[in-house]
Amino acid sequence: MKIAITQRVVDYKNGPYDALDHGFYSMFQGHELIPIPNQLKFFRTNTVTDSDLIVFSGGNSMIQDDWQFNYERLVVEKHVLDLSMAYEKKILGISRGTQFLTVSLGGNIVPKDGHMTDHTVNAQGARVTVRSRHKEVLGSIPAGADVLAKDDDGNIESWKLKNIGCVLWHPERMKSHWMPDDICWHK
């Protein structure tokens, strides 16, 4: 399976660079992982059209006044989402990728103190400890989406809408890489 994946932008001494969490290589072991550059001039349409799954990864912020916000990444991801939807690709959102997909498809995110932690979600009759590294929760999800997991405070942590599945946590940073079965398209 070919999996195209967005990357976080990290600012370092000599300028920005794209980065991908090492956990994705073990999470998607046995599949071809294709990183998507955060510059439209280097993006190739066939990165999406030739892929079986498009992953919108975590990292950076969706909040424009946050120092970790990156406009160039947002532009690339909007383009990738438009192509993915046009070609009816399977889509997986992880953490910030879930926030991006939620907002892009009509939902919203809201600030939440104390959410940058490991915490428990309830999904498919199981209680699973997951890892979150953001300061926001989902205020609402896209119309027609099904809730797959909630935390103990009742916040939605995972949803699915047709061929789009999202988790608000970081499965790539968990030993089990756990996600609800309904959206484990790479297995």
Residue ranges with predicted function:
Residues 129-130, 165-170:
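Active-site-proximal beta-strand elements of phosphoester/diester hydrolases
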Residues 1-96, 103, 110, 115-127, ...:
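N-terminal beta1-alpha1 cap of cysteine-dependent amidohydrolase-like domains
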